[in-house]
From Swiss-Prot:
Residues 1-30 have a biased composition (Low complexity). It comes from the Eukaryota. It is found in: Plastid, Chloroplast. It catalyses: GTP + H2O = GDP + phosphate + H(+). It comes from Micromonas pusilla (strain CCMP1545). This is Translation factor GUF1 homolog, chloroplastic. One of its GO terms (cellular component) is chloroplast. Its main location: plastid.
């Protein structure tokens, strides 16, 4: 019995092994279920592929098996920092009107070249600010270096320099374009040429860039992609796409244009190949003295200012002593590198390359956009052309709703100015608003962005006064004073003349709305220049118009009259003499400085009447009568009043002697008289923005 048990156990093991053999085979290699003779599904091992057999034989010790390494296709690591000659470098930017797909195209190019891993991709990758993502615009430019293997087998370095598209940042755009040799002009296939398209193309042409036209969003229903023909763009209806607009308005040849959809990944290979073939490489000037163009800078709270630049001549590396030719500041480079778009440190950068530099710089005001970097030893004698300091065009007052937050507002503005050299501010005091700051901005969008960042990032409650522009006031003794605050305008007795800034305005709109838009421009004292028909259904209107008429509600009125289809672009032209006056507002006989404005004399009554009527609606009633007046100097041109609320002091008198009622009424009248003398009127925030909402349709000036 003792020997039978092991035998039975051995038989059991053999039986179990036989039963589990198919599963063991499946564990060693692929298998599948098959039906046996009894109709049951059983797992049956199948022959393993060659690589599996080879691995199994190798592990079993079979000496006759030769393991051959897998032959992989030669690839270029997209994350490698390639050292290539200038002939294999392409520097380009993307220019487009808002919402034509510029950020989406940049994202797709980064993904197509595997610069950014799929797991790290996100929409608007180069737009790092929350405001940029929410509004769908580019405010702060960025750059990215891509490695691309072209059809000719060569590996190229493509430096994408992303640019803001709004006119407020036109100087930054011009310096970014100066760092490139080419640009992608992105036009929405269903909307055609828009205002910012024209403005940015002119900047590109001024910098002598090679322009590649990209007709984007061909996957939209309005673009009719089913009519696409190979290597042709003329499948679009001219009135829908704007191919004729590109040729007629911009003067660009569309024969080599690329039809694409950045969202659907259509035409990306053609775009990359055109970048390599059409955009010229940077010149090989590595042996000349260093000259590098600063086209962006931002403040890092831990590293100081990070300078983004393009090496034009020479080369630079870690430890080099450099200086900025326009500011005269000198620094030693602590770190240098490239953007992918995250920072990747390297040892040196040569002519034609784009990168960043950290050198213990404390403020972006010391590293201004457009400045030239050179070495302190063997430095260049000629800076790169085109440098100028950003000049604010629009001013407004910022006051904290809580007077205790004045110091917080000052600190917040100082922090923003570290990262925004174009922002200007100085303390201001108002009898109605208390202490605040008079701030200067590049334009309305710049003003809105700064205000929103102050409220969002620093949790401040702000009251913003109506925006104004910079006027040149010539006094009787020949002196010229720049005035941004209407309250600072000298008295008429000492003024000789006032000049206001005029801008060149271009409006693009469907032809159905031309009449209404011309009426709007004439009401705002615009001078007609030209009208161009882009196609049968689209028109371009050109006007010379005062900037002060544009910075208020002109854009809102433009969109309202065109049902949202019109777009506009403006650029500074010149200062011109105008018959301007200061319109003061008095509330309860006290001047409200934040409500003062400068307007044309012919429109002063319309402005004054509209303003006092609007304030009457917005200022809450008090226990005393509130007079509201609009005046020019000492002359009141419009007035109204808010009637007092009356408390029913006779409610407790149920009949009785009339003398008791007269006594109560007399006491109430005396109290209201005293309240009117010493009472304060609180003006809500909406009242200060009422200046923007005054109907200016009546009256015009020249």
């Amino acid at each position: 019995m003792a020997s039978a048990a092991p035998a039975s156990r051995g038989a059991a093991r053999a039986s179990t092994a036989a039963r589990d053999a198919p599963f063991a085979a499946a564990a060693r290699g692929p298998g599948r279920f098959r039906r046996d003779g009894n109709g049951r599904n059983r797992l049956v091992a199948v022959r393993a592929p060659r690589r599996w057999t080879t691995r199994a034989a190798a592990t079993s010790g079979d000496a006759n098996v030769v393991i051959k390494p897998k032959k992989e296709r030669a690839k270029v690591d997209p994350n490698a920092v390639l050292q290539v000659p200038p002939s294999q470098i392409r520097n380009f930017s993307i220019i487009a009107h808002i919402d034509h797909g510029k950020s989406t195209l940049a994202d797709t190019l980064l993904s197509k070249t595997k610069t950014v891993a799929a797991r790290d991709m996100e929409a608007q990758l180069l737009d790092s600010m929350d405001i940029e993502r929410e509004r769908g615009i580019t405010i702060k430019l960025n750059s990215a270096r891509m490695n691309y293997v072209a059809n000719d087998g060569e590996t190229y370095v493509l430096n994408l320099i992303d640019t803001p598209g709004h006119v407020d940042f036109s100087y930054e755009v011009s310096r970014s374009l100066a760092a490139c040799e080419g640009a992608l002009l992105v036009v929405d296939a269903s909307q055609g040429v828009e205002a910012q398209t024209v403005a940015n193309v002119y900047l590109a042409l001024e910098n002598d860039l090679e322009i590649i036209t990209v007709l984007n969003k061909i996957d939209l229903p309005g673009a009719e992609p089913e009519r696409v023909k190979v290597r042709s763009i003329h499948w679009f209806p001219y009135d829908r796409v704007g191919v004729r607009e590109i040729e007629d308005v911009l003067g660009l040849d569309t024969e080599d244009a690329v039809v694409a959809s950045a969202k659907a990944n259509i035409g990306m290979e053609d775009i990359l190949e055109n970048i390599v073939k059409m955009i010229p490489p940077p010149p090989d000037t590595g042996d000349e003295p260093l000259r590098a163009l600063i086209f962006d800078s931002y403040f890092d709270p831990y590293r100081g200012v990070v300078v983004i630049f393009r090496v034009v001549d020479g080369n630079l590396g870690v430890g080099d002593a450099v200086k900025f030719m326009n500011t005269g500041k000198s620094y030693t480079i602590d770190e240098i590198g490239i953007m992918r778009p995250q920072k990747v440190p390297v040892n040196r950068l040569s002519a034609g390359e784009v990168g960043y530099m950290i050198a213990n710089i404390k403020s972006v005001a010391d590293a201004r956009v457009g400045d030239t970097i050179t070495t302190t030893k063997d430095s260049s004698t000629e800076p790169l052309p085109g440098y100028s300091e950003a000049t604010p065009m629009v001013y407004c007052g910022l006051f904290p709703t809580d007077s205790d937050q004045y110091e917080d507002l000052r600190v917040a503005l100082g922090k923003l100015q570290i990262n925004d050299a174009a922002l200007r501010y100085e303390p201001e005091q108002s009898s109605a608003m208390g202490f605040g700051f008079r701030c200067g901005f590049l334009g309305l969008l710049h003003m809105e962005i700064v205000q929103e960042r102050l409220e969002r990032e620093y949790d401040l409650g702000l009251i913003t006064t109506a925006p104004s522009v910079v006027y040149k006031v010539y006094t009787s003794d020949g002196a010229c004073v720049d005035i941004a605050n209407p309250a600072d305008l000298p008295d008429a007795s000492v003024r000789d003349r006032i000049e206001e800034p005029f801008v060149k305005l271009e409006m693009f709109a469907p032809s159905d709305y031309v009449g209404s838009l011309m009426e709007l421009a004439q009401q705002r004292r615009g001078e007609f220049i030209d009208m161009t028909y882009l196609s049968e259904s689209r028109t371009c209107l050109k006007y010379d118009i005062p900037l002060g008429e544009v910075v208020t509600d002109f854009f809102d009125e433009l969109k309202s009259r065109s049902k949202g289809y019109a777009s506009m672009e403006y650029s500074f032209n010149e200062y011109r003499k105008s018959d301007l006056v200061r319109l003061d507002v008095l509330i309860n006989y006290e001047p409200a400085d934040p409500l003062a404005c400068i307007c044309h004399r012919d429109k002063s009554y319309v402005m004054g009447r509209g303003l006092v009527d609007k304030l009457k609606e917005l200022i809450p009633r008090q226990m005393f009568r509130i007079p509201i007046q609009a005046s020019i100097g000492t002359k009141v041109i419009a007035s109204t009043s808010i009637s007092a609320m009356r408390k029913d002091v006779l409610a407790k008198c149920y009949g009785g002697d009339i003398s008791r009622k007269k006594k109560l009424l007399k006491k109430q009248a005396a109290g209201k008289k005293r309240m009117k003398q010493f009472g304060k009127v609180e003006v809500p925030q909406e009242a200060f923005m009422a200046v923007l909402k005054v109907d200016q349709n009546a009256g015009s000036g020249g």
